[in-house]
Design a protein with these regions (language model features):
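Conserved alpha-helical substructure of the radical SAM core
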Residues: 57-78, 88-211, 215-221
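Radical SAM/AdoMet-radical enzyme domain recognition
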Residues: 162-180, 189-303
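Radical SAM enzyme [4Fe-4S]-AdoMet core and its adjacent flexible, acidic
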Residues: 2, 6, 15, 258, ...
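Flexible, acidic/Gly-rich N-terminal and inter-domain linker regions that tether
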Residues: 2-123, 135, 486, 490-505
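C-terminal target-recognition/interaction regions appended to catalytic cores
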Residues: 445-567
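Alpha-helix N-cap and loop-to-helix initiation/capping positions
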Residues: 152-160, 247-252, 277, 316-320
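A short, flexible beta-alpha/helix-coil linker loop
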Residues: 144-149, 240-243, 306-307
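A short, charged
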Residues: 4-12, 17, 22, 85-121, ...
Length: 569
């Protein structure tokens, strides 16, 4: 305590100031500014200056709204990984969407569609074909709920879908060529095969479906129809290996996988990772995917995006970032997959650059922000069945440096044919053949990619190995406009715009909800038109009944419970 004196108009006043000790980490720990960016207020969406800083070996974001005060949020769980990943920060060639022209300065994220500030073309476009779902998950904010005030049914017509495909294909310099059908549950659309055929007619080559897999489990022929129409991959929700962590489709997953085996559809497991809910099962998810590698070619973890109003304590309970997930995977795979095996998504840009320099044509690139996503490839040792990450037998860093160096030489005027032959000749030097999994010839695969100037030969890579990915979509608490402007996962909409994921879903009142409501009808109108009730499409848990039934949880056919117990040990 110390005394402070000041002179009032009448007399000298002495006040005692009590020094209140704040023992919080925030006060005692020093912070170091990394960079400045812009974000939004989670309460009013005002665009704010934001500071990204390091404290206690973690990366945080802080912003102050003049009305709603300061918001501080965990941005990246490891400063060391942030530094490593940031070395791959590159800008793409941009995207010129045909229907949105901004003559003056853009006020990002106010004018998404895409605007001239955007730095990445559409790597994967999403189209929402319905907001109906056959499940009623308590935590889901998206599906249409009958009886809810203002409830509407959003299902774009076939003509609207075709127009959206034309818009995507008109994007330059890289026409959109990869589409994800999403919802709701897309399989509820009776005309889903017609929609897929429209996409193929408009020259969209790669089509995958974001689904819970229940319809594939219940009706294999419906799955076959979708496959024959042109959808060759399922982006399959899979949040854990136990019924507690994955009540959504735990019992149905084995049957959905059986259907995919029979019809020739590949699968990507998509776990939404929530701290304190299912982050203890990440290793188990990978092991269950390993048991089904004949059909499951990837696992793409998505650290949760926190929607709605949440206090800081509640956010800290559930918030998990890419480095946190990667660290848990190392622990839960007993060090078979380590934190050093992961690279940020834009690390593959040198390969794109050398192909582009050789072909003298713009090529598909993954130029997203380094903090958006990460990945690694793993293989299975034939003898021990342990995981073998690609980094164990490939000097990936050296190979990327070679690609970047040779692309610069070609752009500087070197003979591109001689240069590419030199690249191919040197590839073998980066690969340890003794440690390379049997049946895999990585040097040959990269040589084919380079000489054919195409990624088509990557297919054999997926068959022999499994991709592990991370994609952390933003929310209002951690929105970073540096990331948003580099986003390459987009939505196509009936008003013929192409909108980045982290604008479309992060600010739904500006984008997703406003657009869908404009092109919707009431639930009652839909029921009258279709001659059915909305609740008729709900899944009644047919594969979960009867303790001794083959279709019951933990059925002998799939041995799901047995495999789940193995996966968690």
């Amino acid at each position: 305590m110390k005394a402070v004196k000041y002179q009032s108009s009448k007399k000298l006043v002495t006040m005692a100031l009590i020094q209140i000790s704040n023992q919080s980490t925030k006060s005692l720990s020093k912070k170091a500014t990394i960079r400045f960016t812009q974000s939004i207020c989670p309460d009013c969406n005002m665009i704010l200056d934001a500071e990204v800083f390091e404290r206690d070996d973690q990366v945080f974001m802080s912003k102050v709204c003049p009305t709603h005060g300061e918001c501080e949020e965990l941005y990246f769980g490891s400063y060391d990984m942030y530094k490593k990943f940031s070395t791959y920060w590159v800008d793409g060639k941009g995207a010129h969407a045909p229907n949105v022209m901004m003559e003056d300065k853009c006020s990002c994220p106010n004018n998404c569609g895409l605007c001239t500030n955007h730095l990445s073309h559409s790597g994967l476009a999403n189209i929402i074909v319905t907001n109906r779902c056959d499940l009623t998950c308590w935590y889901c904010f998206f599906y249409v709920k009958k009886g809810l005030e203002g409830a509407y049914m959003y299902e774009p017509t076939q003509d609207q879908v075709r127009a959206m495909m034309k818009t995507l294909r008109a994007e330059r310099p890289i026409p959109g060529n990869s589409m994800q059908i999403t919802g709701g549950e897309p399989m509820l659309r009776e005309d889903i095969t017609d929609l897929i055929k429209i996409m193929k007619e408009e020259h969209v080559d790669h089509i995958q479906m974001n689904t819970n897999g229940i319809r594939h489990a219940l009706d294999p022929e419906a799955g076959r129809d979708v496959r024959m129409a042109g959808c060759n991959n399922l982006y399959l929700s899979f949040d854990g290996v136990t019924a507690r962590t994955n009540p959504k489709n735990h019992w149905e997953i084995p049957y959905a996988l059986d259907t995919c085996r029979k019809i020739g559809t590949t699968v990507v497991f998509v776990p939404t990772v929530i701290k304190s809910i299912n982050d203890h099962e990440l290793g188990g998810i990978i092991r269950y995917a390993q048991k089904n590698m004949d059909v499951v070619h990837a696992v793409n973890f998505q650290p949760v995006s926190l929607t709605g109003r949440m206090g800081k304590t509640e956010r800290e309970k559930y918030r998990i970032t890419i480095p946190d997930c990667i660290q848990r995977i190392e622990e839960q795979t007993q060090g078979q997959i380590t934190v050093d095996d992961w690279y940020p998504v834009p690390s593959c840009m040198p390969l794109t650059n050398v192909i582009e320099a050789f072909s003298s044509k713009p090529k598909y690139e993954l130029s997203i922000h380094f903090a958006c996503g990460a990945g690694t490839y793993i293989f299975e040792d034939a003898d021990t069945k342990k995981f073998v990450p690609m980094t164990r037998f490939c000097d990936l860093q050296g190979m990327l440096e070679l690609f970047e160096d040779k692309s610069e030489q070609i752009r500087s005027g070197a003979n591109k044919y001689f240069t590419m032959l030199e690249v191919v000749r040197k590839l073998k030097g980066f690969i340890d053949k003794d440690k390379q999994p049997a049946g895999l010839d990585l040097a040959k695969m990269f040589s084919t990619i380079l000489m054919k100037r195409s990624f088509d030969s990557m297919g054999s890579f997926h068959v022999k190995g499994m991709f592990l990915g991370m994609m952390h979509f933003q929310d209002k608490y951690n929105e970073d406009l540096e990331r948003l402007q580099r986003c390459d996962i987009h939505y196509v909409t009936p008003d013929l715009r192409i909108i980045p994921f982290c604008a479309f879903n992060v600010i739904p009142e500006w984008y997703r909800d406003r657009i869908q409501k404009k092109y919707s009808i009431t639930v009652e109108e839909w029921e009258e038109r279709e001659g059915e009730k909305l609740e008729d499409g709900l899944y009644r848990g047919l594969m979960r009944r009867g303790a001794g039934d083959d279709l019951a949880a933990g059925c002998a056919k799939s041995q799901m419970f047995h495999e789940a117990s193995q996966a968690t040990t």
